[in-house]
A protein has these predicted regions:
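Anionic-ligand binding patches
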Residues: 4, 8-154
Length: 154
């Protein structure tokens, strides 16, 4: 899944660098559920359709979990960052971050967005939407990818 995101990010970063003539960083993130053929993956934002809301997307995941008579499934969030110094940069910075956990048919919490209400990270008895923002900003897939990116950037 990360390789598809990397390819998409590299294209986005190349367009950004060509347009701005400045250092460009592209991000692609998503929820991956291996038992559901690695869905929603790169289609996470529009899983239930182009005009789908976060609620629509969560409902589609929940329905698929229920269709296979499960309460939850292993899953992970993944974020890929690609940084280019110029449109033709031969050595882009590429960074990936993942957080593993489970997606559940139980949608709980007021915080976050996307699939956070049904994603329960490993080591927590809370959904991502229930975890305080300070903690979430330390453990999330985006935080991990950002830290890895900055280490390479130096």
């Amino acid at each position: 899944m990360g390789s598809e995101m990397c390819i998409r990010d590299r294209i986005k970063a190349k367009h950004g660098a060509a347009f701005s003539n400045k250092y460009t960083i592209a991000d692609d993130s998503g929820l991956v559920i291996p038992e559901l053929n690695y869905e929603p993956g790169i289609y996470s934002a529009r899983y239930a359709g182009d005009a789908a809301s976060d609620l629509d997307n969560r409902k589609k995941v929940i329905k698929k979990i229920e269709n296979i008579s499960k309460q939850s499934l292993d899953a992970y969030y993944v974020c890929v960052l690609v940084g280019l110094r110029a449109n033709d940069d031969p050595m882009p910075i590429i960074s990936e971050g993942k957080i593993h956990g489970r997606v559940s048919i139980n949608s709980i919490g007021d915080g976050g967005f996307g699939y956070d209400k049904i994603f329960y990270p490993r080591g927590f008895n809370l959904s991502m939407a229930q975890i305080d923002s300070e903690t979430k900003n330390k453990i999330s897939h985006r935080a991990i990818a950002s830290k890895n990116f900055l280490l390479q950037f130096k």
